[in-house]
Amino acid sequence: YILEGSGKLLRPMLVLLSAKTCGSVTPETYSGAISMELLHNASLIHDEVVDDTYERRGRSSINARWTNKIAVLSGDYMLSNALISATKTNSLPVLKAVSNIGMELSDGEVLQLTNARQSKSTEEDYLKVVRKKTAMLFFFFCEVGGLTANATENELECLKNFGEYMGICFQIKDDIFDYYQDIEIGKPTANDLQDGKVTLPLIYAIQNSTNGKREEIMAIIDSKDFTRVNVDLVMNFAIEKGGLEYASKRMEDFKALAIQQLTSFPESEAKQALIKCAEFASARKI
């Protein structure tokens, strides 16, 4: 099941390219990349249970096809294997990075559960969750790549910043997808809205509207009355108030910040590939 839905493998690619950008790919780099991919998949499986998600990339999630118990145990099994792969790098900093990922993801999930359904959520609140739940994954993927290539402190800092900004860009694109009408993006459209999550397009729309419609939308969010009719009402409100355009602009801002972090590295195919990864994060169709 996992192998059939392996996805884009962007995360391990970031580990390998980060190592190559500041040195060379080593056997330890491959172990680090495997660890990061396993950890990423474990986090997705656990997220599906927490968020009651039953579809990903156009197919049933593990908890939908089997049970929540099987999903949790599968995620735990992957997490254990991620730790085993991390030990093969023979690097304490890599092990520390893997441990930090687990902590940041858990913090982010709790933060999201606390803030996601609040109509008064701000862009700052939103970015705090995004940094914890998505950007930190990219941050640590790039750090692990650099660590396995013996990168300097300055190189590591640039790689980590690149990963964080690219991760924010990537998540904003995902949140824009929630307003699409195409199931091919890999999850049901309006999935976040139906779960009551207030993401950047809607946050912008609420904060930049002063008429009675704004109060109506906030009341729906706070009451958690997410019927299909109300979800459509909220989606159309965000679109009409320019929420998608604003989110797209912020996404491009973070993409530019990500690419800017690579300016100190000498020109190489690996560096150009990292730039293309950042461009892909904002331009992708799925």
Residue ranges, per PLM feature:
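All-alpha prenyltransferase/terpene-synthase fold signal
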Residues: 1-286
